[in-house]
Amino acid sequence: MSGHEDATHPPPDSKGSRLPSRTPIVVTLRGEAGAEVQIELVGRAHPEQQDYWDGNWLRTRVKVRAGGFRGEFEPELRAEEFARLRDGVRVCMADLRGTFVFETLEGQLEITAKGDGLGHFRAECRAEDVAGIGNELTFTIDLDQTYLPPLASQLDAALKAFPVLGHPGA
């Protein structure tokens, strides 16, 4: 270790993560009846890049459970998409009529959850296994406000491990 590192703050690994590679980073939108969208962040797609446009692509593994459907695919998603989702979830934790959105640049995973003001949320979701030309699954996940704090904490951990790099105007 150099003089600037310690065991609690390891340097970035070859995948651009600041956590040991054995530590999985998972973000899960859970709902009623076992429905969920689980996103495992595997690493940066271009760890050698530090700019906004190339450096923020993340390799992920997405698992979907909705009713009788199960599926898994491996899209590349962007760090700032997780930041926008986290910000929206935090708003909804305070405003039960709020909406949080996960909208991806290539359209492979879309989630829009709206609150009814009483603590219930309905997430309208769409997953596409190949960007622009793939098979598509649309589904809903019903959840309540108690699912939001753990989701926000997972998003905080994801963004700590894979922070947004640079700025779009740079």
Residue ranges of model-derived segments:
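Generic detection of short hydrophobic beta-strand segments and adjacent strand-loop junctions
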Residues: 27, 73-75, 100, 137-143
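Intrinsic, low-complexity N-terminal interaction/targeting segments
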Residues: 37, 51-59, 101, 108-135
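Beta-strand elements of well-folded, non-transmembrane domains
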Residues: 64-68, 79-81, 127-131, 145
